[in-house]
Regions:
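Solvent-exposed serine/threonine-rich low-complexity stretches and specific carbohydrate-binding patches
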Residues: 141-149
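Short, low-complexity N-terminal tether/leader segments at secretion or assembly junctions of large
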Residues: 1-20
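Short, surface-exposed beta-strand/strand-loop-strand elements in extracellular ectodomains
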Residues: 137-138
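Collagenous Gly-X-Y triple-helix signature in extracellular proteins
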Residues: 18-114, 120, 150-151, 155-392
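A short tyrosine-centered beta-strand micro-motif
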Residues: 124-126
Length: 392
């Protein structure tokens, strides 16, 4: 049975010192298990002194407050992650026990064309690679006419959903990446009239301001640039959480309605959370493979960290946390069903995001199936989140 710790308020300096001295004395007498941390600051001191191992075990739980709700965190690792600040080398990793109450979009469908300079009113056309979704890609070339200019820094979108004929979709023009009201919406016809904008492919042609067609339809699986990463590390109120990270970026579905994940969190809890150095694979379709490195307060776990193995050979996105490897139903890291990976939202097992991309796609992201098996989901879908962080 795991232990659960909840802190109501901060201690005075004298109380902190008395508690710390009692911990030290008890540990010397091998009685550490009889004591509990009494505050977030006290817990941080125990982590930094490497005494937390005597008191807190893997799967023990901590409770903290976010606005009017209590969030329960599991201890999933100790001294497992690398603090971003080199003056510290000790850490204790926490992850939400259940999913956050609201499912979140990883990243929104993106613009297909970026207007580096003003795009005058007139007729244009673009091609979608004939080998891509040939069932619904039913024009050899898509022609449209703008009656109003698009300013420099503006975008064109083509919101082509799944299992829909592309010929039925309208081109939307926007004055900027943050604008949510189109300048105009115009129908497409088959034709090659006017100026050619180029060919949309899965790889994209970023240098010529053309996005990957997969990201145009389903959003981006690049975690470093993702909307969900911004949400996780924001303490801002709704409407102020998201800003464009690329020239093709578009506002996520929650941009105007969701406070940042850190918004309303217990200040004493936030004071002990340090930035963690994390590694994320890049897809091999339009991001060139390899990996990105970043330092974040809150982060999603990689598929490897939840005991599912590597997405890309040679890219190590962290190591399996003891919580996932030690309590797994599986005898070795694998992608099959695992009850230890199941997480609930609203009392029901639900999908939840990893940060790892599905490497063979520009838009799909690894996720955990309600059975605990490996899955993937399109970035634009709202899926559960179970963030992690480190007391450092």
């Amino acid at each position: 049975m795991s232990n659960q710790f909840g802190f109501v308020s901060e201690e005075t300096y004298a109380e902190k010192m008395d508690t710390q001295n009692r911990f030290l004395a008890a540990i010397v007498e091998n009685q550490g298990g009889n004591l509990k941390p009494t505050s977030w600051a006290n817990t941080q001191a125990l982590v930094r002194s490497n005494l937390i191992d005597k008191i807190v075990g893997i799967a023990d739980q901590f409770t903290m407050q976010r606005s009017s709700a209590n969030l329960v965190w599991d201890v999933i690792g100790k001294n497992h992650d690398t603090p971003a600040d080199p003056q510290y080398d000790k850490s204790m990793t926490l992850q939400l026990h259940d999913q956050f109450p609201t499912a979140m979009q990883f990243d929104a469908p993106e613009a297909f064309y970026y207007c580096e300079t003003e795009l005058p009113a007139g007729t244009y056309h673009f091609v979608i690679d004939s080998t891509y979704d040939s069932t619904y890609n039913n024009y050899s070339s898509y022609q449209f006419t703008l009656t109003q200019a698009v300013p420099a820094g503006g975008q064109l979108t083509f919101p082509w959903g799944s299992n829909v004929n592309a010929s039925t979709i309208k081109v939307n023009s926007f004055a900027s990446a943050t604008s949510t009201t189109p300048i105009e919406q115009v129908a497409v016809t088959q034709g090659t009239g006017g100026q050619g904008l180029g060919t949309l492919t899965t790889a994209g042609d970023f240098a010529n301001n053309l996005n990957s067609i997969q990201r145009v339809r389903y959003g981006s699986n690049n975690y470093k640039e993702s909307a969900i990463r911004q949400w996780l590390n924001s303490d801002k109120a709704k409407g102020n959480v998201w800003t464009p990270q690329t020239k093709f970026d578009r506002p996520p579905s929650w941009a105007a309605t969701a406070d940042g994940f850190m918004y309303g969190m217990d200040a004493d809890f936030l004071a002990v959370i340090g930035k963690t150095h994390i590694i994320v694979a890049r897809n091999t379709v339009c991001d060139g493979g390899g990996y990105d490195e970043m330092d974040d307060y809150f982060f999603l776990l990689s598929r490897r960290e939840v005991y599912m193995g590597n997405e890309v050979s040679g890219v190590i996105e962290g190591e399996p946390y003891p919580y996932y490897s030690d309590y797994s139903d599986l005898s070795a890291a694998g992608t099959g069903a695992d009850s230890n990976r199941i997480k609930y939202r609203g009392g029901t097992a639900q999908y939840w995001w990893n940060r790892t991309p599905y490497a063979g796609s520009g838009s799909h992201v690894r996720s955990v199936h309600p059975t605990g098996a490996m899955n993937y989901s399109s970035a634009y879908i709202s899926v559960g989140v179970a963030p992690a962080c480190n007391i450092i």
